[in-house]
Amino acid sequence: MQKQIPQMVDPTLAEMGKNLDEAMKILEDNQRPSEEEKDGKKYTRKDIPGPLQGSGQNMVSVLQLVQNLMHDDEEEQSPSLRRIQNVGEQGHMALLGHSLAAYISVLDREHLRKLTTRILSDTTLWLCRLFRYDNGSAYYHEDDREGLLKVCRLVIHSRYEDYTTDGFNVLYNKLPVIYISAASRPGLGQSVCNQLGLPLSCLCRVPCNTMFGSQHEMDVALLDRLIKDDIQSGKCPLLLVANAGTPGAGHTDKLGRLKELCDQYNIWLHVEGVNLATLALGYVSSSVLAATKCDSMTLTLGPWLGLPAVPAVTLYRHEDPSLSLAAGLTSSQPVEKLRALPLWLSLQYLGHSGIVERIKHASQLSQKLLENLKNLSPVKTPVENDGSSPVVVFRFVYEGCKSDSTLNLSTIERDSDALNQWLGDQLAALVPSSGVDIVELEDEGTCVRFNPLMTCAVLGTTAEDVEQLVACLRMKIPVLENTLRLKEEFRQEVERIAGLSYINDYSWAGLGVLRYEQFSEEQDAAKREADLEKITVALLKKLNELETDLTFCSGPEFGAEKNCIYIGMASEDLDVSELVETITAMGREIEENSRLLENMTEVVRKGILEAEVQLNKANEERLLEEGVLRQIPLVGSMLNWLSPVQATPKGRTFNLTAGSLETTEMTYISKAQTTGLTPPPTPTSAHGKRQAGQKLFKRLSRNSDAMSETSSISHLEEVESLEALPMPEYDSSAAENSAMGEPFATAEQSSTPSIVPTETSSEGSQEPSIPSANTAESDSLR
């Protein structure tokens, strides 16, 4: 296996297989039983799936199948849209921990108990020291919400003494209340209530600040009033979930004041958030440092340190181990304690310096991006960074709206969300290693978020990636500004032209949306809708074939508007009027061609029927003229030899344009086939006159105007230089003829000297008069 695995394409799978193979050899220590050949009857059944039939497959085949499944969808995706996780050596240690946990679980019970106790105690001690959480216990769980669920069970057991015996009957008389911030993860409170079997009335969402402080932090004064109201109503305030780094903006609640409030009303304080990672740094802000005094906190070390498939950890303080066991925070099964093994291996591999370096690197990346954003005036950070958060949230804001009176402020606000959505998608596609994503904030709207603590260790984000992100942002800002500035002009141009309808779709970030309205008298709505769909599809195809920088599409697949043309982002020199006129002209042409094709089909069908009638009539006339005897094979040949028919055969041609049967007499007379009427020339737009290399829908820039002025000036200088040349002498008779209206020499004739004999020669000689080309050129220029 060791020799065959390195031949695999995926280096990660090959390296993991190699590490597992070496680890198994070291642990087994030559105690593997000799492999005996498997003899016997192979049982096969038709209902058994193919991969399970037979005697099984080797490890290489199974890993090859896993590799194919992992990389099957990557061929359909572009490389820029993929986010490849950076699985380093520390990641291999975490993956190795899962395999070792499975191997250790087969040890004898006494060895397993000692080993799991050592692993669990070491990991818990290390985490409590790293994150400044003294005298704490740890619970390791796969789902990051499971820790909060177990803590809620612990608090219920602590506050309701008869809960173990009476169950939910105890809760009925005095309902528990769980307080959760409005800025917490969506669905967190509902998930806890569903798992605990509590009604949603036990969940109280605490609003954030509206007047003072950050709008993403919990309103402490309002929370105090809510707790007092619940106590007066006979309810039991149970637990408060606070944030040290909200999921959206990364802000930290006032944990110090919240802890005092919880101590006053005997409420359990649970804290979670990305800012808890900064507790491992040497300098920690006071707002985050207050989290060390809380009753429990949840840490997600996997994304923070780039460790795949490691469990989340909930640190908590409680003195009664029996209640912790009843709540599920501790387990008597040694196998359950092996969840900490991947972390136990990874933390030892990284060491204290490696852990601090990864968290510090993420904080430095966010500060670097924040400093660069200050130099970009159109990009704003609507959520002020409180200094303790590594999360950067920014948003594009059009500054020209205040100075430009033609733009509607309400329209710009509605379009800004779509533009920022487009901006976030573009940045994520252009710089996938940056890990930027899009977040919807309640007051600020759609924003772009850079959260390096959750992505940089996994994606391997570097300072160069941040610089590339800023460069892409600078490149996209002019496109956003030009598109937003031309939106109103595009709407006016579309509404000005009959046959086009402007569609208000604020979810589209491009120039705009329009629909081509056909001039049809069709009464059937389904037929009219089908015709419009055909015209729209053909129009989109022709527009995408044009040489232009614009993009045209049919919009979202499940959008509300159908048969529309969605126009993408615009450049500064876009000629909106030419664009709209071109779309209208193309739509009319497609509609007329389709209508002409339908009419031609009907005309041709009628013409064919009429031609069949005429041909049958001609056959009957020929039969009457020639007689019946001439139609008999042998007799007809004899009669034709004795008395040949003198009638000329009548040829016929079918005119597709007119749909009629015509004679071929003119064809035989003129010895050429007539083509009928010449179709009228296709009208060309004045906008079609473009310079060489210039794309469609582009306004002429100042450079092109200056070039035309320079070319005209140089042409005049050339004319003046030609007039300054000495004029050659020529015959006076030619001058008289020219003065009388007879042409002397045109410009075309002067290009090749021609011999013109003079009529009035005193000596009657035929000497030619050869005019000069320069003379004719100068006369024509004058």
Curated annotation (Swiss-Prot):
Compositional bias ranges of the Basic and acidic residues kind: 26-48
GO molecular function, one term: carboxy-lyase activity
GO annotation, cellular component aspect: intracellular membrane-bounded organelle
Cofactor: pyridoxal 5'-phosphate
UniProt-annotated stretches for the region Disordered: 26-56, 673-695, 702-721, 726-782
GO biological-process terms attached to the record: carboxylic acid metabolic process
Pfam families, A to Z: PDXDC1-like_cen (PF22930), PDXDC1-like_cen2 (PF22937), Pyridoxal_deC (PF00282)
UniProt keywords, alphabetically: Decarboxylase, Lyase, Pyridoxal phosphate
Feature: compositional bias, Polar residues: 703-714, 747-782
EC number: 4.1.1.-
UniProt keyword Lyase, yes or no: yes
Highest taxon of source: Eukaryota
Family to which the UniProt record says this protein belongs: Belongs to the group II decarboxylase family.
Annotated protein name in UniProt: Pyridoxal-dependent decarboxylase domain-containing protein 1
Organism: Xenopus laevis (African clawed frog)
Lineage: Eukaryota, Metazoa, Chordata, Craniata, Vertebrata
